[in-house]
Amino acid sequence: MTEHKRRATPPYHQDPDVTALESLPARQQQVLQATVHHYVDTIEPVGSKTLVQRFGLKASAATVRSAMGALEQRGLLTQPHTSAGRVPSPQGYRHYVDCLLPPPGSAAQHLERELTNLSLRWAALDDLMWQLARRLTDFTGLMSLITRPARPKPTLQAVRLVRSGDRLLVMLVESSNQASHLNLRLPHEASNELEAIEEWTRDQLATTGNGSLDWSSLPPQLNLSGSLLREAIHSHSQAQTPAESDAVFHGMSRLLAQPEFSSSASLQPLLELMDTQPAAVVPVGSEQLGGVWIGAEHPKSALEACSVVQAPYHSSGEGIGQVALVGPMRMAYATAKAAVSSVANHLERLLC
């Protein structure tokens, strides 16, 4: 599946799916939760007898087996081999995270105390990010990533064009209440198109509502001025993009040691992403939100075998940064969510 076809809407900022929870019988909820916990702990498919014995389920093995079959029909469990037990599917993990996640427990409180006792008040931001990333990896056993605070990228709200001889002054009005000025050479052939191209941009921005221009709908008679304007806006946008070096990550070796990443075919795209675009772990458009991406929910195909748990932190006057954990879909989600939230809150207290 190509990346541009992947789901772009963050799946995790919505309220828990109450309808799905109510439609899943209590027995199946209990069995799904137990199956997830067993698989996270053991990396082994599980059968009904083991679930009854280990988790003290008040039901016979036959009843639990029936519930597991129903969960498999719903797509929440899967059976890797005919003779094997069952494991959670990506959809099963999603339902678990949305509806069945337990409290994080005492481990998260231990991390809070540990962070409070760290002497980081006067540390430089780079040192602060590195130390907290290492602590996060040591605590969870997952790869951690922390990005520098950055203001949300402004969106385009209006385009104004002013001709001055053979030059064209382009004023870009952005959502940050700032205006950028671009000075371009104006071909003589395009001088009569300015009023029409400005009107076209105005209509486009009103239609899309998100600061984007659909250049594929540009009338053919405006191609000359449109090409000039498109290139100028693109160059300006690229210049505003934060550098990828504004992210630090730690614990790649922990991630690669997981059985899910024993195949080089699944490993190479992930290594390339972390080498060239580590900040892409946090999907564009989710900067102010916190939550969980599971498998193919993430817009980057390199992370389709992973889960990403993230939490934002705010820095006074600097914008928004991110704390994230990357691991296999088989992870302790309650602990991971509590851990990124603790580190994000600690960063806010230190930076504000």
UniProtKB/Swiss-Prot annotation:
Pfam families: HrcA. Disulfide bonds: none annotated. InterPro entries: GAF-like_dom_sf, HrcA, HrcA_C, WH-like_DNA-bd_sf, WH_DNA-bd_sf. One of its GO terms (biological process) is negative regulation of DNA-templated transcription. Keywords: Repressor, Stress response, Transcription, Transcription regulation. Coiled coil: none annotated. One of its GO terms (molecular function) is DNA binding. The keyword Transcription applies. It comes from the Bacteria. Belongs to the HrcA family. Negative regulator of class I heat shock genes (grpE-dnaK-dnaJ and groELS operons). Prevents heat-shock induction of these operons. HAMAP family: HrcA. This is Heat-inducible transcription repressor HrcA. The lineage of its organism: Bacteria, Bacillati, Cyanobacteriota, Cyanophyceae, Synechococcales. The gene is hrcA.
